């Protein structure tokens, strides 16, 4: 996955490039089932009172770090076709206690009108939990809490009982019920590597990790287990319309005896599995590789399990499952059947090892095997999709700096349904209405509803007028602060092309004054500078500190065609860097930009950009900040865990002396240009970041100090590629602005 994406909403995905579930991954996954992995919780949260919505008074009318952490973070939303109710999740954080709680709210359909109240939806039930999924019977909601699955009805819970030692109740990570509600898939970790204690029982307190192959670490953990799906019989007893008992019987590991992952680490959820409408087939995503083969390949496939494989004592193993995507060498994932079962859809990338290849929406006829690429004319990436009916799908995609909603039929006929200065995440579709999460650089996630049926739908602009806001989660914050203005600018690159650049202005901007200005360097390296809302890289926070922010969609970012997106692999120090400099060079000519007070900031590949520009900026900048950035590309090639990414993006290994692309990449390693460093730099890193190891920041800091360059180092021993805990998040913000103010505002 990509190195970076602080697009805190769903997702997305992915700290390096991904499918935005990650990108929307920062708050929670968008499917009913797996617990979101982007939220931070203390290890003993279940023993404490749940965190509720904080009350906060913000002085001065400007957004603060404390204000950011007081915001409710809306994640999943699911609609019940039987009752019309909506269930959604919202997470609250306690800075004082350094922990969070995720709540589920159930809302009545009567509250969902074209004129919702200022308080948003009328809540009829609220409780602690995550991953809501409608059970499909008289308003029963299935959800997760504390690693267990519950059924909730009329404010009362019924835990699904499990009396089988093969299922670790309390450690479950996801669930997916069959349409007939007679079976359930439970996801749990299965041990795949013998521990030190297994080998030496007399050393139970030894902490060493022993490994004999690659992929021994992934994202922020040592790889000693794999998530695997257990198929179980589900027995539910009722008294009238009410659930009286629920139990699980006959668990069967669909990947028994293997080390394979399903869902795939580190961010996969139950969206990577799908039941057929008749409950007789399971389609699942799996990369059936281990060790070195796993580390160098993105070749996952969609497999089909059916017949005896779905029976408790049935014959056959995963080796008997049908590979529906055999021959496609890139990522294939996230299968979903049409309501009538005639088609199965999934997301697909073509090339092995290229995790940022075009993400295509594919369908396959379940009878004839005919395959179709539905988004062939899109020239961009599909983020997520849902079936609307038997012949129509909805999906979101990035184009020219925003993520919008589209509708496509089985013949590939596509209609753009929305436009505007926002990003949308598709949460659910029910009774001709799409439920989306909408956010922008000026507003965090809120739930909206949009009609999506009918042959005569209006154009995207008119259709966007039908977006109805259903929640107003953070109105109490917005009422106390003034947000800055966000403006799209099309700037000219050094090779004569047009580049979309977002310019963010401080609140109460005065064009007769001059402002310190920041060049924001995006990560990924192929994650778009869309209308994202982040709880660290928050442009409204930067604007609140009276900075202008220049955020270019440089070469290598999606949403501007395939050629633009791919003009970065093997050329880290090339046109993408010239694009960044072109953006700041043009903006500094504006009379309100103080060209003597320019800063440069970025994370992941953006951190690489900062380190590289520190040796090439020719005096433009007065301060740098790099978060989780690459300083030494040769070390990064060996240290990062997902070797496919290093191979593709760097063009090969540094010892391949006749490989011109690889040699060009490594010649542009920032550490080679330290002799030209002369500008103050702040280096930030998390020690649990196994995508880019923390020694990169330590080396950069040491190099600066040994060069006599003012530098500061902020290391988080317990954070990964992101900063997730509340107090660390505020420490990050304070350090960030203290450094910038010191060098860009001090007399």
Predicted segment positions?
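Conserved beta-propeller blade repeats
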Residues: 71-87, 123-144, 164-184, 216-229, ...
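C-terminal motif of bacterial Sec signal peptides marking the signal peptidase cleavage site
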Residues: 32-33
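Cap/lid segment of the alpha/beta-hydrolase catalytic domain
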Residues: 290, 465-466, 472-596, 603, ...
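Predominantly five- to eight-bladed beta-propeller fold
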Residues: 40-52, 101-102, 186-257, 285-288, ...
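Arg/Gly-rich low-complexity intrinsically disordered repeat tracts
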Residues: 10, 109-116, 307-316, 454
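Active-site-proximal cap/loop segments of hydrolase catalytic domains
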Residues: 538, 543, 551-747
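Short glycine/acidic-enriched loop and turn motifs that connect beta-strands
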Residues: 92-96, 148, 191-194, 289-291, ...
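Short loop/turn segments that connect beta-strands within beta-propeller blades
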Residues: 109-110, 153-156, 234-237, 306-308, ...
């Amino acid at each position: 996955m990509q190195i970076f994406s602080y697009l805190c909403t769903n997702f997305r995905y992915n700290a390096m490039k991904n499918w935005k579930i990650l990108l929307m991954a920062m708050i929670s996954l968008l499917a009913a089932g797996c617990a979101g992995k982007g939220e931070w919780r203390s290890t003993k949260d279940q023993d404490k009172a749940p965190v509720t919505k904080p009350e906060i008074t913000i002085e001065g009318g400007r957004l603060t770090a404390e204000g950011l952490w007081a915001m409710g973070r809306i994640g999943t939303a699911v609609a019940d076709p039987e009752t019309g109710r909506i269930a959604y999740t919202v997470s609250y954080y306690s800075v004082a206690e350094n922990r969070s709680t995720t709540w589920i709210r159930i809302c009545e359909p009567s509250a969902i009108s074209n004129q919702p109240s200022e308080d948003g939806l009328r809540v009829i039930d609220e409780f602690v939990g995550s991953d809501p999924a409608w059970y499909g019977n008289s308003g029963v909601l299935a959800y997760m809490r504390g690693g267990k699955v519950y059924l909730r009805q009329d404010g009362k819970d019924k835990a699904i009982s499990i009396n089988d030692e093969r299922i670790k109740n309390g450690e479950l990570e996801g669930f997916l019920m069959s349409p007939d509600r007679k079976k359930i898939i439970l996801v749990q970790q299965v041990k795949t590597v013998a521990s030190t204690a297994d080998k030496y029982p007399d050393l139970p307190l030894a902490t060493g990790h022993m490994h004999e192959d690659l992929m021994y670490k992934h994202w922020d953990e040592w790889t000693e287990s794999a998530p695997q799906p257990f198929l179980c019989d589900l027995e539910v007893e009722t008294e009238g319309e009410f659930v009286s008992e629920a139990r699980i019987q006959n668990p069967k590991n669909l990947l028994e005896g293997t080390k394979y992952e399903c869902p795939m680490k580190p961010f996969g959820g139950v969206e990577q599995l799908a039941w057929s409408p008749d409950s007789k087939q399971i389609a699942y995503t799996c990369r059936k590789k281990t060790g070195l083969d796993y580390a160098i390949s993105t070749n996952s496939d969609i497999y089909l399990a059916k017949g005896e494989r779905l029976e408790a004592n049935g014959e056959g193993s995963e080796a008997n499952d049908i590979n529906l995507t055999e021959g496609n060498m890139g990522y294939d994932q996230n299968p979903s059947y049409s309501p009538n079962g005639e088609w199965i859809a999934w997301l697909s990338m073509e090339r092995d090892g290229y995790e940022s290849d075009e993400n295509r929406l594919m369908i396959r006829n379940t009878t004839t095997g005919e395959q179709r690429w539905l988004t062939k004319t899109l020239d961009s990436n599909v983020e997520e999709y849902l079936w609307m009916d038997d012949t129509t799908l909805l999906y979101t995609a990035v184009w020219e700096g925003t993520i919008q909603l589209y509708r496509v039929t089985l013949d590939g006929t596509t209609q753009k349904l929305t436009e505007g200065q926002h990003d949308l995440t598709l949460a659910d579709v029910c009774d001709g209405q799409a439920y989306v999460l909408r956010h922008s650089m000026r507003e965090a996630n809120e739930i909206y509803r949009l009609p999506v049926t009918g042959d005569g739908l209006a154009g995207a602009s008119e259709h966007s007028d039908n977006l109805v806001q259903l929640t107003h989660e953070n109105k109490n914050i917005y009422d106390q602060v003034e947000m800055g203005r966000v403006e799209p600018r099309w700037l000219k690159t050094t090779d004569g092309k047009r580049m979309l650049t977002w310019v963010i202005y401080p609140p109460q901007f005065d064009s007769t004054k001059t402002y310190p200005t920041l060049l924001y360097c995006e990560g990924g390296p192929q994650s778009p500078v869309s209308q994202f809302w982040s709880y660290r890289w928050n442009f409204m926070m930067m604007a609140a500190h009276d900075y202008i922010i220049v955020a270019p969609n440089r070469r290598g970012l999606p949403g501007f065609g395939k050629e633009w997106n791919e003009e970065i692999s093997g050329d880290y120090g090339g046109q993408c860097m010239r694009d960044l400099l072109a953006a700041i060079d043009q903006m500094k000519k504006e009379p309100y930009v103080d060209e003597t007070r320019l800063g440069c900031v970025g994370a992941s590949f953006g951190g690489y950009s900062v380190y590289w520009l520190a040796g090439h900026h020719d005096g433009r900048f007065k301060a740098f900040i790099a978060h989780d950035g690459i300083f030494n590309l040769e070390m990064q090639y060996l240290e990062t865990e997902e070797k496919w990414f290093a191979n593709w993006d760097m063009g090969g290994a540094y010892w391949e002396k006749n490989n011109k692309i690889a040699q060009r990449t490594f010649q542009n390693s920032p550490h080679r240009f330290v002799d030209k460093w002369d500008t103050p730099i702040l280096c930030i890193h998390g020690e649990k970041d196994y995508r880019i190891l923390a020694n990169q920041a330590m080396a950069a800091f040491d190099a600066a100090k040994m060069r006599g360059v003012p530098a500061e180092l902020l290391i988080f021993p317990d954070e990964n590629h992101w900063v997730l805990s509340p107090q660390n998040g505020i420490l990050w913000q304070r350090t960030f602005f203290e450094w910038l103010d010191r060098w860009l505002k001090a007399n």
